[in-house]
């Protein structure tokens, strides 16, 4: 494919236009009075969202160079989201301000490399300052963090705090859609473990990059599955039942994985494969625990059981399964409470008998996973659009609360960043030249979140910043009052703020040092119907898997598994 090249100031200017296009769409959502953004969908009603990462991922610009700038900011949002679960809008606002200041100084003749070094030194001091100001989460702080992160929704804050109280701060909490208008929370049996899907083609929700099944069947085995022939009987039975299927095994690979992926892609069978947690004997124990939880049978080599003899009666059942790239959560049906209790009692007896500290640790983990349960927050709303928006807010609030438990909290509303900006004066005084300018770039940019929060609330951002500096108080954008935000419960998770600063500095400093941009040259679209080809003709070759020697699959409408 031919390439387009752009150099020097022209290249940086095009990147900045892309950065601004995306950041301007995202920044309106920050703060308790942030606005919503409407996203057009190819099918169905548009989405109305207040989530920075969702907005960023939906933006694609026509100009290839500007689009690269937008993609860089998308990376800021997604990296912050992946590591902290929240803070994407703050990171975007910071990155935009740093890019603007950095490119302005570069155009004036500053050394991009020295600017970058100064920015990195400033970021290191800000991170240290956050750590020194951070306070551990205790008491009502959990509810306060959740409330602030959900844009002031006290019901959400109370519900998340209650969920963490019921299943512990390290417990499993999931968010799902309710069949009613009310938002409610319940605790049910379930389990989560650190294993994700074996292939990204199993994803059912492309926006969130997760695979979700309602009322799935679960095949449990400690075997490695390489060929599909052993799975044919159970796959036929599951396909006829109409239920989704989750396969938990030592590993699904090769021909078996390719066949499952193809039939999932064709819509023939809703299926996903996940590697079982742990290793060796502990893997077998974990699979046995899941079998008890779901009412299934573990197809084990130790008992000379084979996959070709599996029936629907051997499969486990769950209310819901959510699989991400790195983890799997199973929400059980509560139909096997007695069996789970007996299993926990048996593990406790094993715990009493062991003298190994390592074994004790692993046994306690198994007990916690089995007995801890899963807190399920069911989100209700009057319309589907409102439901999606509310669900995103609750997920963000939950992620921010977990981050707060991990690294503590600082005063919110951008007030901590404003204080840390003042502290950079001493660092700037120690440096000279363009490194000092790099520190000043970060210093000025740290005021951007406060400025935007105030602007979204209908106040003059410059006036608010100056008043905060003179009074030493934070600005409550919800009430318009200057007060001690930590004392009034307006707090941010330290981890979220830290990652927002680090990711923003990382991308901005790289962009400032960019000299050449290379993009793909857009190819003209061919006229409709050109060449007289069938637009779906490319699918015809998928019938060629008939050579696998499984003619019995043809009768169930699964030609790809023949």
From Swiss-Prot:
ATP binds at residues 29-32, 86-90, 413, 476-478, 492. It is found in: Cytoplasm. The keyword Glycoprotein does not apply. Keywords: ATP-binding, Chaperone, Cytoplasm, Isomerase, Nucleotide-binding. GO terms for molecular function: ATP binding; ATP-dependent protein folding chaperone; isomerase activity; unfolded protein binding. InterPro entries: Chaperonin_Cpn60_CS, Cpn60/GroEL, Cpn60/GroEL/TCP-1, GroEL-like_apical_dom_sf, GROEL-like_equatorial_sf, TCP-1-like_intermed_sf. Transmembrane segments: none annotated. Its EC number is 5.6.1.7. GO terms for biological process: protein refolding. GO terms for cellular component: cytoplasm. It holds the Pfam family Cpn60_TCP1. It catalyses: ATP + H2O + a folded polypeptide = ADP + phosphate + an unfolded polypeptide. HAMAP family: CH60. Belongs to the chaperonin (HSP60) family. Forms a cylinder of 14 subunits composed of two heptameric rings stacked back-to-back. Interacts with the co-chaperonin GroES. Together with its co-chaperonin GroES, plays an essential role in assisting protein folding. The GroEL-GroES system forms a nano-cage that allows encapsulation of the non-native substrate proteins and provides a physical environment optimized to promote and accelerate protein folding. This is Chaperonin GroEL 2.
